[in-house]
């Protein structure tokens, strides 16, 4: 998207003040959730988000391109997550068949299609037996388990 922007193939009608392409941490995952969830014919929610970043008069083609880029990034994230889980279980050995992994976090919980994409990637990796489940307050539970393990010595 940075390349397309600098080549003026994206946001052609814009005044060139789109710093969210180059400013770190300016485009939050909540925007990705909204963009992926926008199934309207004119992608009005995508346009609304772009307006928040002072990108006005975006074309439908611009909005489709942004949605496609976000789709690719989030799909890659889901596939990377699946590969990390697979790698951990591969390292642990064959005795861990049919395990459940608890996951906490807003990306896993709220991002459209994310859970499905993680599960699909695990199946592609030959591990449909790994079940990923949402664990609300997972970080608190994880901290408690670590503290328990340390206390037991």
Set out the residue ranges of the language-model regions.
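ATP-binding/phosphotransfer module of carbohydrate and carboxylate kinases, centering on a glycine-rich
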Residues: 1-153
């Amino acid at each position: 998207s940075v390349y397309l922007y600098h080549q003026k193939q994206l946001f052609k009608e814009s005044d060139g003040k789109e710093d969210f392409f180059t400013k770190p941490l300016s485009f939050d995952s909540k925007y990705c959730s909204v963009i992926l969830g926008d199934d309207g014919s004119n992608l009005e929610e995508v346009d609304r988000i772009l307006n928040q970043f002072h990108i006005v008069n975006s074309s439908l083609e611009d909005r489709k391109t942004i949605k496609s880029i976000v789709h690719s990034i989030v799909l890659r994230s889901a596939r990377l997550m699946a590969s990390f889980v697979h790698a951990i279980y591969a390292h642990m050995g064959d005795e861990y068949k049919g395990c459940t992994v608890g996951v906490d976090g807003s990306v896993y919980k709220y991002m459209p299609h994310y859970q499905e994409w993680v599960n699909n990637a695990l199946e592609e990796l030959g591990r449909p037996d790994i079940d990923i489940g949402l664990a609300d307050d997972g970080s608190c539970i994880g901290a408690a388990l670590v503290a328990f393990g340390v206390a037991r010595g």
